[in-house]
Structure formats: C-alpha cells, structure tokens
Amino acid sequence: MENLTPKKIVEELDKFIIGQESAKKAVAIALRNRFRRQLLPKELRDEILPKNILMIGPTGVGKTEIARRLARLVNAPFVKVEASKFTEVGYVGRDVESIIRDLTEVAMNMVKQEHTERVQEKARQLAEERVLDILLPQPRYTRDMNEAEERTRYKETREKLRKQLREGILDERYIEIDLKEKVVPFGIISNVAMEEIEINLKEMLGSFLPEKVKRKKVKIPEAIQLFTQEEANKLIDMEKVTKEAIERVEQTGIVFIDEIDKIASRGSSYGPDVSREGVQRDLLPIVEGSTVTTKYGPVKTDHILFIAAGAFHVAKPSDLIPELQGRFPIRVELNSLGKEEFVRILTEPDNALIKQYIALLATEDVYLEFTQDGIEEIADISQQVNEKTENIGARRLHTVMEKLLEDISFNASELKGQKITIDAKFVREKLSEIIKSEDLSRYIL
C-alpha cells in the first residue's frame, strides 16, 4: 500500500477503465487517505472518518468497475449491493445490516484462503503421509520376526511408494478414504430476512451432532487434494482468522451501493416514497458508523468506505434525505461514452473486448484480425444504437460484438486454421440491416 500513491492508483485503474479521470482521482485520494490514517497516533486515527463517495452517471460508464478494481488493487473486502433490493426493517426482504454480514463473509473467505496458502505445503505433506498409510499400512510385528529388519524393509518400501506417488505413477490407482463431515439432518424453510437465524441454528445443531465419517473411493490425486483441505483446516487457527477478518472489514472494507437513486424519494408522504425513505433511514446508521452483529462477532462500520452510485435520471441527489447526503461529501460526475471512448475501450485496456474474442477463438485455431476501420465501425454502430434506443454505455459493445461474431463462433469447428479479417465492410454486412430497423436494433442489439 505504501507504494500506491494516488497517481499510481490512477495508472492501475487506467489499465482497465477508459476516461472518467475525476472519478478515478476521487477514489485514489480516498484510498490513499486510508493509508495515511494508519500512520497516525491511535487517538487521532479514530477521529478521522472515511470520505464516502457519490458517483453520478448513466449506466455502463464504469462506476462499478472503478470500485471493483480499487478493492482488488489493495486486496480489500468488497461487496456490491443494489439499494433497490433492500426493504425497511420489519418488512419481507433483506435488511441493510445484511450488507455488513456479507462483507464480513467475504473477508472471512479472503483471510482463510491466505492462511490456507501459508500452511498448504505442510498440509500436503500430511495428506501424502495419510495416502501412504492407506497404500502401505503399518505392519504388525510378531515375536518370530526380526523387528529391526522389518522396520527397515517397511521404510524402504514406503520411500519407493512416495517416489512413485510424486512422479505420478500411481495417479490412476483408486483407494478408499474416510472423510469427516458434520450433517444437520433437516433444512429450515425461511425467507431472506431469516437467513442469519438459519445459519446460526444450523451451526449450533451441527456442534451437538457427532461427526459422520463418509467412505469414498477416489483416485489418488483427488485423495491427496481432499486430505490436504482437511489437514489445512486442522492447521488453521480459526480464532486468529476471525479476528483478522473483522479487523480487515473495519479498517479496509469497501461497500459499493448501486442504484441509490432508486431509493431517493420525491417528497410524497404516502405510497412507495415512504418505504424508500425508510430504507435511507436504515442505511444512515451503517454509513454514519454503528456496530452490526454478525455470526463472527460485532463489526464496527465507522471506517468502512461507502461508494454509492446512481444514474439520477428522474431523481436528483438532493432528493436523498439530508442526513444521508451529508454522509457522501465527495461527489463525482461520470461522463457518457461516445465513439472515441468506445474505440479505446475495444483496444486499450488489459482486458479489452477484442483481445478477449481473439483469445477465445484462438483456442479453436480460428484467428481473428481486427482492422482499425473495422474497430471504428463497431464503435460507431454502438454509439448509433445507444442514441436510437436506450443508452447503456459500454455494455452496448458486448451485444454488438456478440452479434457480429455470432456465425464465426457457431461455425468455429469448421473454420480451423483460418484467418478472418474483421474490417468495416465485414461489420457493415453483418449489422447494417439491424441498424436500419429501429425495432430490430431495439430487440437484437
């Protein structure tokens, strides 16, 4: 994190997201401020709260991608939720506290994975020993046997088997293994609001039930894999994992709330606006800073970074309740994308669409070559369709590319070894009829 200066963060985001400089700058500063905060004395550190961000812009311009890439960049727990999916406490549906429970679950999986990787080598060695015990059980020594000689012979045979095991000679051999599993004998039918109770009840019942041993017949590589997982779980200190995960959520967690404009009310005192305002009021304590109870323990939300986003076509940011507006002090507007940006999106990012399609079809020995005029034609058509129908931003490129390469993808097995050039003429031939008919472009692209 020390090397991730705001400029460096923007450079990393540039590899995947075209344009939107002001949004990138805002998130880069917010992220750097987290690192700066960690260097302060504890008394001052607790006083500095994250500056939450409100992104305003149409769909498909990179709002979600900026937040997702940001979280991946710093290996922070990240969860994306849609504001419109939540209901007020007391109503059927998910309550807003489940956001923090989901974020804690993500952090638990991340930290557990990291701890598993640290003990992986040791776990594999133990798994190997268990497989060797099955292949060559310990002999029972009798009085008539020369015990020292038998031990030497057993050790030599075991080492030979170990060598064969590591060289893959025994990969096709089947063995019977015993795996431990806890089984709760019934499921609980519940709605989403009851999910936490259901999980806790299942875990509580699971701790009372004896471990069931299940016998399976598997190939040796699979046995090693299953034993490695089992041994790794034994080696991991789950108390330490839980403590680290909660700390990571509290200090580095990022929550992306999409479609926040859908819960903005227009000032009516009845109807759906009342419910929307209720969701905003439920969100407020979490964004402001409160303690949420999860199955892993209490989680404080004071220093979690919240990034909210919405198109705000109908509602305005000022339609959000004043208290919630005040909790998103940084506001950035994202620009609509046009032909120029589409050309760059198709070619520049590390995960550019054209690179993806070239790689996909190359797996079947079909080689695509896109000319510059072909790329510009794809971008131009995407812009035209966005203007004629709904503007869905860069997502339009996906639908246009799918339609353009539909026949090639379908007949790929018959086109082995061929090189296909995608130029402006090819693009027009495939898509011109659809573009001419507004009805067709509305339903197909």
UniProtKB/Swiss-Prot annotation:
Listed as disulfide-bonded, the cysteine pairs are none
An annotated Gene Ontology molecular function: peptidase activity
Q: Which residues cross the membrane?
A: none
Keyword Nucleotide-binding on this protein?
yes
Task: Please give the Gene3D superfamilies that the UniProt record associates with this protein.
Answer: 1.10.8.60, DNA helicase RuvA subunit, C-terminal domain (1.10.8.10), P-loop containing nucleotide triphosphate hydrolases (3.40.50.300)
Query: Its GO biological process terms?
Result: protein unfolding; proteolysis involved in protein catabolic process
Q: Which UniProt keywords apply?
A: ATP-binding, Chaperone, Cytoplasm, Nucleotide-binding, Stress response
Binding of ATP, residues: I18, G60, V61, G62, K63, T64, E65, D258, E323, R395
What's an example GO cellular component term for this entry? Answer: HslUV protease complex
Give the main location.
cytoplasm
Q: List the InterPro entries.
A: AAA+_ATPase, ATP-dep_Clp_protease_ClpX, ATPase_AAA_core, Clp_ATPase_C, HslU, P-loop_NTPase
The superkingdom of the source organism is Bacteria
Report the Pfam families cross-referenced here.
AAA, AAA_2
Give the subcellular location. Cytoplasm
Protein family (similarity comment): Belongs to the ClpX chaperone family. HslU subfamily.
Q: Which PANTHER family match?
A: ATP-DEPENDENT CLP PROTEASE ATP-BINDING SUBUNIT CLPX-LIKE, MITOCHONDRIAL-RELATED (PTHR48102), ATP-DEPENDENT PROTEASE ATPASE SUBUNIT HSLU (PTHR48102:SF3)
State whether it acts alone or in a complex, and with which partners, per the record.
A double ring-shaped homohexamer of HslV is capped on each side by a ring-shaped HslU homohexamer. The assembly of the HslU/HslV complex is dependent on binding of ATP.
Q: What does this protein do?
A: ATPase subunit of a proteasome-like degradation complex; this subunit has chaperone activity. The binding of ATP and its subsequent hydrolysis by HslU are essential for unfolding of protein substrates subsequently hydrolyzed by HslV. HslU recognizes the N-terminal part of its protein substrates and unfolds these before they are guided to HslV for hydrolysis.
Q: Which NCBIfam families match?
A: hslU, PRK05201.1
Q: What is this protein called?
A: ATP-dependent protease ATPase subunit HslU
Q: Which organism is this entry from?
A: Thermodesulfovibrio yellowstonii (strain ATCC 51303 / DSM 11347 / YP87)
